[in-house]
Amino acid sequence: MFSSLYPLARASLFKMDAEDAHHLTLRMLGAAGRTGLARALSSRVPDAPRTVMGLTFRNPVGLAAGLDKDGAAIDGFAALGFGFIEVGTVTPRAQPGNPRPRMFRLPEAGAIINRMGFNNSGVDQFVKNVQAARYRGVLGLNIGKNADTPIERAADDYLYCLERVYPFASYVTINISSPNTKNLRQLQGAGELDALLAALKNKQQRLADLHGKLVPLALKIAPDLDDEQVKDIAATLLRHNIEGVIATNTTLSRDAVKGLPHADEAGGLSGRPVFDASNAVIRKLHAELGDAVPIIGVGGIFSGDDARAKLAAGASLVQLYTGFIYRGPALVAECVKAIARGQTR
């Protein structure tokens, strides 16, 4: 039902400031999840289970991190048919993020530019929100570092967040690829990444012993990587037995949107313009990783065919963000059905 209403809702939402519309949508979905209204409005999405990272996903189409940074609307999003949900990015302490305005639509390109800067209520409130949710499907919890934490101490923030979210996560995503936290992408460098993943794997094993379960780790990377960087990252993932990789985050490139309103705004560009770059990284990763480390593909999915293209490039699962904002819940079912059709041919 909500899928059929979304085009009307979008017309009103797109007249608003992009971030105000985002917050209004989150409040509505959060309220719907708490009251049970979400179930009445739920989208009919067929089950298409698959097992990845040792987890069974209801279907291969998930919600990407960033839409629900505080995990405040998990039940509302769950009713829309996603096969898994990822929330965050969360940091140890609450922080406001970058000054507004910091989110801009580029409808001519099917794109969004954001420079949010990991605005969130902190990991303690995040955990409370996650615990309050009734959703029992696969839930990814995405962690990052505070803006005022020196990059040399970044591991401290990731380790702290990992310990706090571990008992409540199906998997944990290590976000080192946002362009909106100063120097964060330095952690994708070979030496920095090796040290960070070594520390996180050590912590993961100790937490697994403590809680009696191994929660997989996934690394989220940028599309703005050359071939050698992708190879180095793949080798580091294999060396540390990281369970998954998410490709990709937003891009700093503006080649596809030159001349459009807001194109020169600072921040990460998402949506259709990142589709090809994301797929290229997925193909390169898959060539290096094979089936040893599953890939979650995200970036520019606006149709079922787009989702299938991500899988054809080497992804095992996909996530939606900007396409979901433009297309609404109907995109979830379209992607699930298109992937299922491709598997039966």
From Swiss-Prot:
- Catalytic function, reaction form: (S)-dihydroorotate + a quinone = orotate + a quinol
Provide the protein's localization.
Cell membrane
- Please tell me which top-level EC class this enzyme sits in: oxidoreductase
Write the Enzyme Commission number(s) for this entry. Answer: 1.3.5.2
Q: Does the keyword Transmembrane helix apply?
A: no
Q: Which Pfam families match?
A: DHO_dh
The residues listed in the UniProt record as binding FMN, with positions renumbered to this chain, are A65, G66, L67, D68, K69, T89, N142, N175, K220, T248, G271, G300, Y321, T322
Record's Gene Ontology CC terms? cytoplasm; plasma membrane
Question: Which Gene3D superfamilies does this chain map to?
Answer: Aldolase class I
Please state the pathway this protein functions in, per its UniProt record: Pyrimidine metabolism; UMP biosynthesis via de novo pathway; orotate from (S)-dihydroorotate (quinone route): step 1/1
**GO terms of molecular function:** dihydroorotate dehydrogenase (quinone) activity
The entry marks the following residues as binding substrate, namely K69, N114, R115, M116, G117, F118, N175, N180, N249, T250
Annotated active site = S178
Question: Which cofactors?
Answer: FMN
Q: Which domain of life is it from?
A: Bacteria
Q: What is its main location?
A: membrane
Q: Which PANTHER family match?
A: DIHYDROOROTATE DEHYDROGENASE (QUINONE), MITOCHONDRIAL, DIHYDROOROTATE DEHYDROGENASE (QUINONE), MITOCHONDRIAL-RELATED
The function of this protein is:
Catalyzes the conversion of dihydroorotate to orotate with quinone as electron acceptor.
State the similarity comment.
Answer: Belongs to the dihydroorotate dehydrogenase family. Type 2 subfamily.
Q: How does it assemble?
A: Monomer.
Recorded protein name is Dihydroorotate dehydrogenase (quinone)
What is the organism of origin for this protein? Burkholderia thailandensis (strain ATCC 700388 / DSM 13276 / CCUG 48851 / CIP 106301 / E264)
Q: Which gene encodes it?
A: pyrD
